Amino acid sequence: MVAIQAAEQGHVGLALLERSDGPQLRRLFFRLSAQTLYRRFHSPVLRPEQAQPQRLLDVDHHDREAVVAVVDREIVGVARYARRVGSDSAEIAIVVADDWQRQGLATRMLSALHDRAQSEGVRQFTMSMQADNRPVVQLFRRFYPEIAMTHSQGMLEAVVPVAR
């Protein structure tokens, strides 16, 4: 991990995910409840292999980036983007360990991810979330006040500019 905001003992820091962070990412998976996994992957995920951990570790810090929240060298949250091939648009996703939710980590990670995306030439984020996932809907509405969401079959879709 490459520190963005250093963490003091017992406090949360932010870092860029590295391919070598696989063991920590796998441990995060086992900290997530079935509901949190479903919210993140939009389908039931029972084993880490179903979440395609190698794909989740595939970061190049340009087209694919991930910011992690870290406490005592353990990952407790991940915010990532993946740029669409040949585009300046990237899809984003965020997950926070259940015991760390509602403490501002998603906001901090989204802010850092937004800054990274801006510096790498990403011009817009696309996102999909379950319509009843109120914490995530509220997060995006707070962070992107101009957000317009479309509703289809229980999902919300949105596109927001990265340049603010």
Enumerate the language-model features and the residues they cover.
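Long, contiguous binding/interaction regions
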Residues: 1-164
